[in-house]
Swiss-Prot record:
SUPFAM superfamilies, per the entry: Ribosomal proteins S24e, L23 and L15e (SSF54189)
Protein's organism: Dictyostelium discoideum (Social amoeba)
Keyword Membrane: no
Family: Belongs to the universal ribosomal protein uL23 family.
Swiss-Prot/TrEMBL GO biological process terms: translation
Biased composition (Polar residues): 8-20
Entry's Gene Ontology molecular function annotations: rRNA binding; structural constituent of ribosome
InterPro entries attached to this UniProt entry: Nucleotide-bd_a/b_plait_sf, Ribosomal_uL23, Ribosomal_uL23-like, Ribosomal_uL23/eL15/eS24_sf, Ribosomal_uL23_CS, Ribosomal_uL23_N
Keywords: Ribonucleoprotein, Ribosomal protein, RNA-binding, rRNA-binding
Physiological role: This protein binds to a specific region on the 26S rRNA.
The protein's name in its UniProt record: Large ribosomal subunit protein uL23
Gene of this entry: rpl23a
Chain positions covered by the region annotation Disordered: 1-20
GO cellular component, one term: cytosolic large ribosomal subunit
């Protein structure tokens, strides 16, 4: 059967297209295309965007939207209390002879303070405890490893009055 031709029952169709029909098919499509191109030229191209000029060789990632967190429940039920309150910061006032001279001479009260307290914390603690305005605080660490603070009061407050209130003099 490989060598034999099988005749089919369907008649052959002529699929060739005459030249006159070909031009008539192509002509309307070309006219439509030309019309569309003309209207596009008339309107102008609106989506033409210019490229941003890069002035740096380093690429910095753009800052993206960062929404604030909205937790379903608080992770810490109670806020931490500050351990550095005025009672922990100020350990004791100094009552040595040189400390009393500073009270009389330079309006300064000397305190032994907590090792981890800084100058602003010492100033706030003195202001809160004794209702005075602090001008400046000098600190030093003693050879014994303790911190000493020299608290100079502002001129409208007398260090002698405050020392009297504490019980130094």
């Amino acid at each position: 059967m490989a060598g034999k031709k099988v005749k089919s029952n369907t008649p052959k169709q002529d699929l060739s297209v005459s030249k006159s029909k070909l031009t008539s098919i192509k002509a309307p499509a070309a006219a439509i295309k030309a019309k569309a191109a003309a209207s596009a030229v008339k309107k102008g191209v609106s989506n033409k965007s210019t490229r941003k000029v890069r002035t740096s060789v380093i690429f910095r990632r753009p800052v993206t939207l960062n929404n604030p967190k909205k937790p379903a429940y608080p992770r810490r039920s109670v806020n931490k209390i500050t351990k550095m309150d005025q009672f922990r910061i100020l350990k004791a006032p100094l009552t040595t002879e040189s400390a009393t001279q500073k009270i009389e001479g330079s309006n300064t009260i000397t305190f032994m303070v907590d090792m981890f307290a800084n100058k602003s914390q010492v100033a706030d603690a003195v202001a809160k405890m004794y209702d005075v305005k602090v001008k400046r605080v000098n600190t030093l660490i003693t050879p014994r490893g303790e911190k000493k603070a020299f608290v100079t009061l502002s001129p409208e407050f007398e260090a002698a009055d405050v020392a009297n209130k504490i019980g130094l003099i």
